[in-house]
Amino acid sequence: MVVRENTMAIQNRRLGKHGVMVSNLCLGTMNFGWKTDEKESFAIMDRALELGINFFDTADTYGWGGEEGDTELLLGRWFALGGGRRDAVVLATKVYNPVKRKENRPEVNTDGRYLSAYKIRKGAEASLKRLKTDHIDLYQMHHIDRDCPWDEILQAFDHLGAQGKIVYTGSSNFAGWDIATACQEAGKRGFMGLSSEQSIYHLNNRTIELEVIPACRHYGLGLIPWSPLAGGLLGGVLQGVQDGRRLSDDMKKEIAKHRTKIEKYEALCAKLGESPSTIALAWLLANPAVTAPIIGPRTVKQLDESIRATEVTLSESTLKKLDAIFPGPGGEAPKAYSW
């Protein structure tokens, strides 16, 4: 059963234990300047603010339709339009990989460490320039760097914070152990440490329930799930095929691998009278550990459709049915391992 509550349910939540308030949906910008042109990207961002979505996520390497960094440049042009746009947004971006652009010499990381102090400082300065802003609200490590010492990494982020160039530090794609280590090492040095973790999390991939979610809860991190629709697998893909939608080879393989589950899932969504994408997002929003799933609309229409997930509450019986279709890992560690 699905209970429809109100017609506008974008809510603000704290980012973990921290005081900043962010919308319970995060606007992902990976498609901007690639699958979505600049005009439509601007319209999506304007509409997001109208709807109450104030949390925007990007990365320094986004822009695969042209050059890496193009998405940050696009956001910078949108901020430059004024009208309070920058002040209205809690802006998150990421650092880790070299950003390849034609006008730059190839970026050489002589020590091979992608979270070296040199790389973090250089990455922040370049992102600030592209984004046309003086600060990044949430600066995230895009991946773990197991070679660079935490002393160097944490001090680099702390220095940026002291300079007013970043406000909060986040992680992405970290294991529970990595989160715990980062938070412990930051605490030893009197640094604020991590404020959030961005992980892949959806009905068909619940691995982070073992250790990442417990680590986020213990250390007070906000959780920002990416790929909430499993790249489209949870977005009504089988119905789409019937309607003539063309699929990539990768998606065909995913369907073949998970067809039984997806058939049951789409049938359940039909009985509930909601789209599969709505149910997938609503399932994440029902988890108190989740701060804001990242949505990646390619059109304003898709953005508006995403809002429906915030307007419904899934009943306990529906949650149990979803668990039966997509069983989790068996609980949190070490409970999932021991008996």
Residue ranges of predicted features:
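N-terminal binding-site loop/beta-alpha segment at the start of enzyme catalytic domains
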Residues: 2-90, 162
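N-terminal small/glycine-rich loop or linker at the start of catalytic domains
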Residues: 16-32, 92-111, 135, 140
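Active-site mouth loops of central-metabolism enzymes
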Residues: 29-39, 105-118, 147-148
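Short, acidic/polar
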Residues: 36-48, 115-130, 179-183
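Acidic (Asp/Glu)-rich catalytic clusters
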Residues: 79-86, 128-132, 161, 183-189
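Active-site groove signature of glycoside hydrolases
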Residues: 128-148
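Beta/alpha (TIM)-barrel catalytic core signal, keyed to glycine-rich beta->alpha loops juxtaposed to Asp/Glu
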Residues: 144-324, 329, 339
